[in-house]
Amino acid sequence: MKLAITVQDLLTCPEINQFRGSGVQWFIGEWEEHHSDDFLQRNSRVPQWFLRDESWVYADNRHFQEYWIIATARNVVLTPTVPVYHYIVLNRKPRPHRQAVMDRLEELGSLSDNPHSWLEYRPDVVAYSFEDRLRREVRPRPVRILDQTAVDNESLFQYPPEQDQSAMALALEPKTDTVFITEKTYAPLARGQLTLSFGGAGTVQRLRSLGFEFPEAVDFSYDQVTDLAVRVELYAQEVTRLAREYTPPQLTQLYEPYRLANRQRIDHLSLVRPRAYREWSRSVPDWAPWAEQIRYNAR
């Protein structure tokens, strides 16, 4: 039997002890930052019996993405969309790739007509980035608040009224050097919105491998481009094209055949035991690709 837990579960969940010495293979996931299996061995809070005697696999956020699917399914409901706007884009931290996308949308003339927000703006957040490959200046943007998530410390899954008035959701994921899909993408998919996800090259391909489907009228070729600056340009161009060629109701109608199926896919992928435990089998989609990339501490 294989059981999936988070690092936090390993440190704080006493139920783990009942599986000690039972022959379980542990799958330990971390979804926030990049670590390695050395992270566990260096952490003084991790029980030594676990490191020494158990068989475990460690995967960082490039591989353990079920967390955000689970959280989305539990917190988001399928919501009717009454489109007034072409798209909405909600940003928390103004990372350079997000600013570059916003700048280009503004230059192309569509940003001001659609709701967008920044919930944080600090020079250190903007300066710290692995996205220097953009090689372009980004204009500082003031805080613009549509929702109260960051202000009132409310749920990540609370959205402003403009969310349900927008035909498309632009999901600018936090990382561009790896495929890391969060609630930014999963939540609008779960709500029933056409979602254009932008992250590391292959993000949309990853979504398709998980069973999500999208209209053929949307050109996702940007997703295969490894050069970040070019990917930003192609993404902004495609968003602008859709906004020019379709009205908001037409975009909603375009996505209608996929709306319910994508929501059901999230629900299916989120079927887990309490406290993020999950029995894994070889039939779980995409087990093989990442199984070759992570190391085993075999008994």
Which residues fall in each region the model found?
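Pol beta-like nucleotidyltransferase catalytic core
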Residues: 1-171, 178-299
